[in-house]
Amino acid sequence: MFLLPRFCLVCSIISTFGFQNPPTNVVSHFNDDWFLFGDSRTDCNHVVKTNPRNYSYMDLNPALCDSGKISSKAGNSIFRSFHFTDFYNYTGEGQQIIFYEGVNFTPYHAFKCTSVGNNDIWMQNKGLFYTQVYKKMAVYRSLTLVNVPYVYNGSAQPTALCKSGSLILNNPAYIAREANVGDYYYKSEADFSLSGCDEYIVPLCIFNGKFLSNTKYYDDSQYYFNKDTGVIYGLNSTETITTGFDFNCHYLVLPSGNYLAISNELLLTVPTKAICLNKRKVFTPVQVVDSRWNNARQSDNMTAVACQLPYCYFRNSTSNYVGIYDVNHGDAGFTSILSGLLYDSPCFSQQGVFRYDNVSTVWPLFPFGNCPTAASIISSDLPICVYDPLPIILLGILLGVAVIVIVVLLLYFMVDNGIRQHYA
């Protein structure tokens, strides 16, 4: 406790001279080992090809365009590419992963599988999907999308049962009913294999409700069976509703292996694409920037729901998205958030990114990295810092040595001057 006055004095000095080192609302990185996944707001190729030299289209500083650390596609998102025919192969690797995408699948698109479907279910799917992606990218370096080969021994082909507007679901694939089967009360199987990745994120989906076809109602039932380990993953329809339901998806994390997709009723589904996860790393939280439209369009908060501590830091602007290129591209607030990618930062926390790792007037919550040491401000003008006293002790020693040197020099010159006057 005898050191507390010194701590108070040092903190008071820091505050007096204006060194606050507050957390800043940006995404950043510790070093050069980072990667960003995005959409048109970070798609340098889109700007070059479609809007030459007009970089106001983006929220990303153009200086980062040649970094080789960005995988972005205008009009797309990882979720959209994962499930639908509108595909872009998002691929990237880094110790520190940043996501700024998701806006290209929102309530504004109003997607639902059938005319009596429910877009709310798809927003739920989006949240569950990104939860798995964020959790896994906190412990994996590499993400890419891969095709999943499957073998179905019947003659029926995949059907575009689930579509809305320009979006057509192709993952999982729906295998149509065989021509010689009279109704949907039948068992169907297909083999699929996962190889080449450490782990995979694959969809397992069902219609959770009573599906009507030719005056009959059916309950969906889907399973994946790992033929190597004997583990089975399954979903059965549990709802009795006949309208307002849609395609409920769970996102399984599976190892490499040989699998059997099984349907006991309705149509067989089999995964055709997977998130490929490779190269395990030391746990490093991902950073997610809110991806939303201008208020004139309806957005959702599913990336925020998916981004939870301790595996994810969420960054957002406090104001409406208002772009300078158009209302949905080039917002100053989000450009400011992405500006942190221009420099290294030592510490990440719930409140934001700290630029320096020495001291701060704000105590970092859920800190990660080399973070400043500080405590809560208990009065309006006196932050009480609690940290290792060694730097202060060393500073005191240096100041003491400096004072001694100055005194010695003063005495030397005073004596020397006195001698000169004596001889003069």
Curated annotation (Swiss-Prot):
Modification comment: N-glycosylated in the host RER.
Record topology, Intravirion segments: 414-424
EC number in record: 3.1.1.53
Region (Receptor binding): 128-266
Coiled-coil parts of chain: none
Entry membrane topology: Single-pass type I membrane protein
A GO MF term: sialate 4-O-acetylesterase activity
Pfam family, one: Hema_esterase
Any one GO BP annotation for this protein: fusion of virus membrane with host plasma membrane
Enzyme class: hydrolase
Disulfide bonds: C44-C65, C113-C162, C197-C276, C205-C249, C307-C312, C347-C371
Active site: S40, D326, H329
Signal peptide as annotated in the record: 1-16
Region named Esterase domain 1: 7-127
Coarse class of the protein's main subcellular location: virion
Keyword Protease: no
Virion surface-side segments: 17-392
Protein location: Virion membrane; Host cell membrane
Catalytic activity annotation: N-acetyl-9-O-acetylneuraminate + H2O = N-acetylneuraminate + acetate + H(+); N-acetyl-4-O-acetylneuraminate + H2O = N-acetylneuraminate + acetate + H(+)
Region (Esterase domain 2) residue spans: 267-379
Residue spans crossing the bilayer: 393-413
Function: Structural protein that makes short spikes at the surface of the virus. Contains receptor binding and receptor-destroying activities. Mediates de-O-acetylation of N-acetyl-4-O-acetylneuraminic acid, which is probably the receptor determinant recognized by the virus on the surface of erythrocytes and susceptible cells. This receptor-destroying activity is important for virus release as it probably helps preventing self-aggregation and ensures the efficient spread of the progeny virus from cell to cell.
Protein family: Belongs to the influenza type C/coronaviruses hemagglutinin-esterase family.
Protein name: Hemagglutinin-esterase
Native organism: Porcine hemagglutinating encephalomyelitis virus (strain IAF-404)
Biological classification of the source: Viruses, Riboviria, Orthornavirae, Pisuviricota, Pisoniviricetes
Originating gene: HE
